[in-house]
Amino acid sequence: MIASGLVFFSLVYSRAERKRTERGRNVMRISSEKISTDQAEFQKKIDEKYMRQAIRQAKKAYELDETPIGCVIVREGKVIGRGYNRRNTDKNPLAHAEITAIRKASRKLGDWRLEECTLYVTLEPCQMCAGAIVQSRVARVVA
């Protein structure tokens, strides 16, 4: 149930376009645009590049005898946040890869809104991390 919900969330959310209204509120509009095969292949190569970086982060967790999960957040072709699982090392139940990467990306941007960012993670996010992803307004998730 959670997996199918996250897949649906990812598909819908990745095609969403956020706009600011006159009152300053964000609204989401779902795009029905289809991308060409060339665009899809190009995007696949980009996704593979950043997923390899997320896997490198997961290896750091593995070396610490942690659950090997890694995460990378990208905006405009630049990595702005990285993280790996450190729950046991830090004695912190919130030290998931996604949470760490979101915290670093927000700090780097100086804003909690990660609206134009893509989050790459080596394992489907748990409920806590999925909530954090939604709250931080990440535009796209690749798992």
Predicted regions: what is each one?
Residues 11-17:
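Bacterial Sec-dependent signal peptides at the C-terminal "C-region" and cleavage site
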Residues 1-11:
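Terminal signal-anchor or tail-anchor transmembrane helices
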Residues 69-74:
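Short beta-strand scaffold segments in enzyme catalytic cores
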Residues 27-50:
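Catalytic cores of nucleic-acid editing and processing enzymes
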Residues 75-76, 103:
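A cytosolic small-molecule/anion-sensing beta-strand core signal
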Residues 44-45, 52, 81-143:
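Zn2+-dependent cytidine deaminase-like catalytic core
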Residues 43, 47-63:
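Short, basic/aromatic recognition patches
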